[in-house]
Structures are given as structure tokens and as C-alpha cells.
């Protein structure tokens, strides 16, 4: 399954790859083969990158799900104006090889939504949390508040987030993506217990990253 968030990119890539392949028809056999294979590789990568596999949460109930595929690179306590004091930050680094569709970590309503322009530092640099382009999202339910950010990286310079203020959202559902490598930082409130450690792998909408 392909994500609809990648349709325009796939269309442009298809046109570009087709042009390369057609051009190759006018070259000698060896060059022709190289160009056609290159076109196929480019198109194949585009389809593979924008894959969007179905996901089923590993647990339901009082859990917070991973908003992104990737690797946990930071778990630390910090205060935050949306989630309160002694909250916990969990940062997930998404490499270009990961599925890049993001999913809602907790059911509730969107109570905070703000886009921040910024730089494009490497996503594994923790300064990128505050200095890079990002979309901040806050969800509130009857039981808790969580806050998370889609952060652009050095390669990823396109955040997709169609969410709206006060929109009701459901845990595990798709809500956007970050194209070509990035990170997602999620802040969970005091009283929630992290279920992941640094170095652990996550799958969006499936891996439980915290319990409350």
C-alpha cells in the first residue's frame, strides 16, 4: 500500500524516470541498459519509500504508541508547558530507510498545533528539536496530555500534517509524514512510564512506547 501523501512525488518521479528510459532508447546497447536500469531503480525507490503498511497496536488500553518508525535516541525527564513538570521526552530518529508515515500516539483532541520554520540540522543532533523546521502537536484526552513534534532533518525538508485544531483523533491512525529522514520527539506527562530505551526500534502505530 502506498501513502496518499506521496502521490505528487511519485507522479513527478514517474515522469522523470520515464524520460530517462525513453532517452536511453537512443543510446548504444550498454548505455541504454544503464539508463533504463537507472530509471527503474529511481522509480522503484520512490514506490518503496512511500510504502504504507497496515499496522495493529501491540497493546490497547492505557498505552501510548510510537508516532514514527525508527530508533530511540533519547529518553530524558524535562518540564514542558503543555504536559507539565517532570514529563518524559522520547526522541525517535527516522532514517531514509524507515517507513515515514506518522501515526497518532494517543486518542483525544488536537489542542495545540503550531508550525515553526527553522534550519535543517542533522536529525540526530538534539539541537534540531528546537532549531529545525517542525510541526508541534498537542493532544488532550480525559486522562492525559501528550505533546509531539514532527522535525525536519538535513535531508527531510517536507513535513506533511493535515491535522486541524480540536479535531478528534484515534490512536494508531495515520496523520501525516516527514519525507526523507527526520525525527519525531514526543513528550509524555508525569505518571507515564516509558516502555522503550535508547537504541530500541519502534514501529508507528504498533510499538508501545509508554504506559500510564
Curated annotation (Swiss-Prot):
It catalyses: a 1,2-diacyl-sn-glycero-3-phospho-L-serine + H(+) = a 1,2-diacyl-sn-glycero-3-phosphoethanolamine + CO2. Signal peptide: none annotated. This is Phosphatidylserine decarboxylase proenzyme. GO terms for cellular component: plasma membrane. The active site is at residue 182. It is found in: Cell membrane. Catalyzes the formation of phosphatidylethanolamine (PtdEtn) from phosphatidylserine (PtdSer). Its cofactor is pyruvate. The modification Pyruvic acid (Ser) is found at residue 182. Its main location: membrane. Its EC number is 4.1.1.65. The record marks 181-182 as: Cleavage (non-hydrolytic). Binds 1 pyruvoyl group covalently per subunit. Disulfide bonds: none annotated. Pfam families: PS_Dcarbxylase. It is a peripheral membrane protein. Is synthesized initially as an inactive proenzyme. Formation of the active enzyme involves a self-maturation process in which the active site pyruvoyl group is generated from an internal serine residue via an autocatalytic post-translational modification. Two non-identical subunits are generated from the proenzyme in this reaction, and the pyruvate is formed at the N-terminus of the alpha chain, which is derived from the carboxyl end of the proenzyme. Transmembrane segments: none annotated. Heterodimer of a large membrane-associated beta subunit and a small pyruvoyl-containing alpha subunit. Pathway: Phospholipid metabolism; phosphatidylethanolamine biosynthesis; phosphatidylethanolamine from CDP-diacylglycerol: step 2/2. Belongs to the phosphatidylserine decarboxylase family. PSD-A subfamily. GO terms for molecular function: phosphatidylserine decarboxylase activity.
Amino acid at each position: 500500500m502506498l501513502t496518499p501523501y506521496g502521490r505528487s512525488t511519485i507522479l513527478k518521479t514517474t515522469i522523470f524516470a520515464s524520460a530517462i528510459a525513453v532517452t536511453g532508447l537512443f543510446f548504444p546497447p550498454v548505455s541504454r541498459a544503464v539508463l533504463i536500469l537507472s530509471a527503474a531503480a529511481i522509480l522503484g525507490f520512490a514506490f518503496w519509500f512511500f510504502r504504507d503498511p497496515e499496522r495493529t497496536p501491540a497493546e490497547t488500553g492505557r498505552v501510548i504508541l510510537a508516532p514514527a518508525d525508527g530508533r530511540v535516541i533519547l529518553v530524558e525527564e524535562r518540564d514542558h508547558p503543555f504536559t507539565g513538570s517532570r514529563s518524559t521526552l522520547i526522541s525517535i530518529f527516522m532514517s531514509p530507510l524507515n517507513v515515514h508515515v506518522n501515526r497518532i500516539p494517543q486518542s483525544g483532541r488536537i489542542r495545540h498545533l503550531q508550525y515553526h520554520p527553522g534550519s535543517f540540522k542533522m536529525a540526530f543532533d538534539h539541537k534540531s528539536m528546537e532549531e529545525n523546521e517542525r510541526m508541534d502537536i498537542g493532544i488532550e484526552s480525559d486522562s492525559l496530555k501528550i505533546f509531539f513534534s514532527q522535525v525536519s532533518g538535513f535531508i527531510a525538508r517536507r513535513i506533511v500534517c493535515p491535522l486541524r485544531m480540536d479535531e478528534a483523533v484515534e490512536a494508531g491512525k495515520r496523520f501525516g509524514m516527514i519525507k526523507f529522514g527526520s525525527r519525531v520527539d514526543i513528550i509524555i506527562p508525569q505518571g507515564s512510564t516509558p516502555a522503550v530505551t535508547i537504541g530500541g526500534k519502534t514501529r508507528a502505530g504498533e510499538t508501545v512506547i509508554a504506559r500510564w
